[in-house]
């Protein structure tokens, strides 16, 4: 099924060129079914790239989805034109009285900072608090997952000895979990981070299930039993060349990074990387939309206001 977007969003041209089924506002308004309402809190600096990555995956799901984008007004974006932000993004004050079936909180390149030192931290915590009564299921990605665990459950992050960057094997620990429907026993996906959370903290401070993990990546996917909280520390959404661009960016600023693991053929950065996680990515996002959101969300989203007591937040 298609994804519905603003007719003028630049990502539309890219997605249509890839034969992704997109429904514009005019066509969508003639359909008499309730689409899923999804809000994307995009914390990444390259916002248009992240938009396209996430929309590509959402468009592969079997449901019509209305997507809105949220940004943190307390942070000034340096890598995206103001006109783009004003046209396609909303502030928290503009959406705080609305309700959504799903919320996606992206990663952000701030993971080596204490959470409280991130300039939009207070605004982000307002979004987390608001989501209890206004969102059915929240999917937290990478730093967004760490931020959610820290604020909602008191689980802190810890520095790794070196950056984890590459394509890594992970094992499905809960094949009975709906998020893993259609997965093989193991899968690969990109990871790119300097920090991690520990299994001990997850067991001691939360009631979350470990859905997937890996020998090299540690925890990979966590979820509450009702799937209203989902945490993914990897980057299913990454393009074929995203890790390559990150690697070259780090080289240019003198970080001297290791070559991303299991990524370039023969570990040769001059070679084009192999895309090996596309099926897992599409399956994961389809499962989240279908099982965590569509199958359980109320038809009248306002009902979320009356039933949020089972959230395990602090």
From Swiss-Prot:
Enzyme class: transferase
Reactions that this protein is recorded to catalyse: L-homoserine + acetyl-CoA = O-acetyl-L-homoserine + CoA
GO cellular component terms listed in the entry, alphabetical order: cytoplasm
Pfam families hit by this protein: HTS (PF04204)
Entry keywords, A to Z: Acyltransferase, Amino-acid biosynthesis, Cytoplasm, Methionine biosynthesis, Transferase
Residues the record lists as binding substrate: 163, 192, 249
Main location: cytoplasm
Subcellular location field: Cytoplasm
Sites marked Important for acyl-CoA specificity: 111
Pathway(s) of this molecule: Amino-acid biosynthesis; L-methionine biosynthesis via de novo pathway; O-acetyl-L-homoserine from L-homoserine: step 1/1
CDD domains documented for this protein: GATase1_HTS
GO biological process: L-methionine biosynthetic process from homoserine via O-succinyl-L-homoserine and cystathionine
Molecular function via GO: homoserine O-acetyltransferase activity; homoserine O-succinyltransferase activity
Keyword Manganese tagged: no
EC number of this enzyme: 2.3.1.31
Site positions per UniProt: Important for substrate specificity: 192
Key word Cytoplasm present: yes
Catalytic residues in the record: 142 (acyl-thioester intermediate), 235 (proton acceptor), 237
Protein family according to the UniProt entry: Belongs to the MetA family.
Purpose of the protein: Transfers an acetyl group from acetyl-CoA to L-homoserine, forming acetyl-L-homoserine.
Cross-referenced HAMAP family: MetA_acyltransf
Protein name: Homoserine O-acetyltransferase
Organism encoding this protein: Streptococcus thermophilus (strain CNRZ 1066)
């Amino acid at each position: 099924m298609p994804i519905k977007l603003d007719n003028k969003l630049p990502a539309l041209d890219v997605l249509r060129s890839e034969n992704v089924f997109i429904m514009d506002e005019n066509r969508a308004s003639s359909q008499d079914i309730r689409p899923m309402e999804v809000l994307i809190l995009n914390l990444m600096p390259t916002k248009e790239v992240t938009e396209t990555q996430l929309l590509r995956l959402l468009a592969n799901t079997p449901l019509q989805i209305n997507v809105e984008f949220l940004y943190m007004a307390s942070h000034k974006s340096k890598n995206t034109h103001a006109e783009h932000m004003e046209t396609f993004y909303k502030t928290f004050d503009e959406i705080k009285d609305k309700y959504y079936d799903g919320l996606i909180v992206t990663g952000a390149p701030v993971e080596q900072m204490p959470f409280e030192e991130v300039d939009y931290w207070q605004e982000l915590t307002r979004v987390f608090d608001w989501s209890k009564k206004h969102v059915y299921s929240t999917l937290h990605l990478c730093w967004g997952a760490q931020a959610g665990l820290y604020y909602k459950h008191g689980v802190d992050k810890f520095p790794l000895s070196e950056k984890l960057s590459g394509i890594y094997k992970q094992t499905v620990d809960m094949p009975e979990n709906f998020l893993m429907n259609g997965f093989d026993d193991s899968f690969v996906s990109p990871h790119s981070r300097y920090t991690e959370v520990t299994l001990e903290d997850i067991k001691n401070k939360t009631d979350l299930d470990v859905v997937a993990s890996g020998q090299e990546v540690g925890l990979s996917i966590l979820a509450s039993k009702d799937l209203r909280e989902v945490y993914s520390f990897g980057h299913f959404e990454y393009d074929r060349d995203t890790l390559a661009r990150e690697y070259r960016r780090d080289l240019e600023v003198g970080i001297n990074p290791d070559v991303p693991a299991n990524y370039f053929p023969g570990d040769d950065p001059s070679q084009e990387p192999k895309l090996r996680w596309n099926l897992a990515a599409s399956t994961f996002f389809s499962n989240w939309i279908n099982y965590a959101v569509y199958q359980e969300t109320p038809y009248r989203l306002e009902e979320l206001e009356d039933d949020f007591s089972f959230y395990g937040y602090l």
